Curated annotation (Swiss-Prot):
Main subcellular location of this protein, as a coarse class: nucleus
Record-level Gene Ontology MF annotations: DNA-binding transcription factor activity, RNA polymerase II-specific; RNA polymerase II cis-regulatory region sequence-specific DNA binding
Motif stretch (9aaTAD): 5-13
Gene3D superfamilies: Homeodomain-like, lambda repressor-like DNA-binding domains
Keyword terms: Activator, DNA-binding, Homeobox, Nucleus, Transcription, Transcription regulation
Domain remark text: The 9aaTAD motif is a transactivation domain present in a large number of yeast and animal transcription factors.
Name of the protein described by the UniProt record: Pituitary-specific positive transcription factor 1
Length: 291
């Protein structure tokens, strides 16, 4: 037999602390067949399948009662909730939502662990901090050695990576005034730039060194060698290639040195003759004017 809702002829007396010991509970005639009276809530749950309404699990942790059982009382509630009132109450919650999912619990623990790591302050004596300080000092020294200013570095990086790089950024990095996260990001960029700048500097130094090697050192000729060359110049001011080679071997000089000496000597002789001619012309002109 199924349970039926109360009619107008069915009455019951509410229980309270004063009348619970004297007044009997008037129950529906067929109530005993629907729900046996039990002193434990688990018996009510086991017989709840015969009721007209579902008995959802209570999601409040501090309550052990269910719909159909009076909270804090051992007397069962035998009336039926109307459907429209049940629809406005708390909807039944699925069991997976009520129970703690192990995967979700692990995820929450991992999230709390990561957030804790983010919030923890950086240890100033950590190896990462020491390495960052060492790189900042080395970067400044190597930048100055290469001849670049902070503005040069900022403009070079801004042309490649964007306008967020400037002289102020490089200055704050060298003075360790950036956050640890931003300093680590900038360290990788500056390390790459420094490597490229040193490669360019090495190529430039190699080119300059090659040009310097082309210029030979000035040769010093001894007084005895100069006297011998002067005698040869008095005899022949334009010696041939064979004569230059012979003189170079005799004086233990390079052939090119002897050749250049004769060229310079002829130029000096020419300047002396020109100067003498001008002086003679000036003297002659003055002498004629005096007459």
């Amino acid at each position: 037999m199924s349970c039926q809702p109360f009619t107008s002829t069915d009455t019951f007396i509410p229980l309270n602390s004063e009348s619970s010991a004297t007044l009997p509970l008037i129950m529906h005639p067929s109530a005993a067949e629907c729900l046996p009276v039990s002193n434990h809530a688990t018996n009510v749950m086991s017989t709840a399948t015969g009721l007209h309404y579902s008995v959802p699990f209570c999601h409040y942790g501090n309550q052990s009662s269910t719909y159909g059982v009076m909270a804090g009382s051992l007397t069962p509630c035998l009336y039926k909730f109307p459907d429209h009132t049940l629809s406005h109450g708390f909807p039944p919650m699925h069991q997976p939502l009520l129970s703690e999912d192990p995967t979700a619990a692990d995820f929450k623990q991992e999230l709390r662990r990561k957030s804790k790591l983010v919030e923890e302050p950086i240890d100033m004596d950590s190896p990462e901090i020491r390495e960052l300080e060492k790189f900042a000092n080395e970067f400044k020294v190597r930048r100055i050695k290469l001849g670049y200013t902070q503005t040069n570095v900022g403009e070079a990086l801004a042309a490649v990576h964007g306008s967020e790089f400037s002289q102020t950024t490089i200055c704050r990095f060298e003075n360790l005034q950036l956050s640890f996260k931003n300093a680590c990001k900038l360290k990788a960029i500056l390390s790459k730039w420094l490597e490229e700048a040193e490669q360019v500097g090495a190529l430039y130094n190699e080119k300059v060194g090659a040009n310097e090697r082309k210029r030979k050192r000035r040769t010093t000729i001894s007084i005895a060698a100069k006297d011998a060359l002067e005698r040869h110049f008095g005899e022949q001011n334009k010696p041939s290639s064979q004569e230059i080679l012979r003189m170079a071997e005799e004086l233990n000089l390079e052939k090119e040195v002897v050749r250049v000496w004769f060229c310079n000597r002829r130029q000096r002789e020419k300047r002396v003759k020109t100067s003498l001619n001008q002086s003679l012309f000036t003297i002659s002109k003055e002498h004629l004017e005096c007459r």
